[in-house]
Amino acid sequence: HTRPELMDGQNVAAHTWRTVVILHTLWPDVSKNCLLNMLYHDVAEAETGDMPATTKWRYPELNELMARVERDYENSIGVGDTVYKVTDDERAMCDIADKLELVFHCYRLMQQGNTLANDVFLKGVGYLQEKYLEKEFFEPVKEILNALTSEYHKPPRLQVTLEQFSNL
């Protein structure tokens, strides 16, 4: 994650491992190519750098250009879509796993008191719901997002404790 306030020591290897675990946990029957696609999904960042997801969301035309540059680089080193072909649904599942890992990461930061993660958390949830809500394979993700967002809207435990003390 490229925003310094959200990094918390996470690197591309840790992010990638988590995305592969999320992908395989949610959809254990995905193809080997899909798993390999997920494994290599951020390898181009070694060449291009990593643009924050929020910037990609804000500037779709820049996102399209970066996607093309990354795709060209991946294909030049033999790890791109031309090598590991995936279906449109599998590509969507990889995107979901990638964004869900971001949501989980931000959720953990928020639990630690990092309020700077709130905006990215909510944008990540919104992105997933807006783009994939109608897809049948999105069902398990809906449950996860519902659980995370219902927990997000609860007041922090410290706030509840202080309110209980003030009522004594």
Model-predicted regions and their roles:
Residues 1-168:
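Alpha-helical, largely C-terminal catalytic domains
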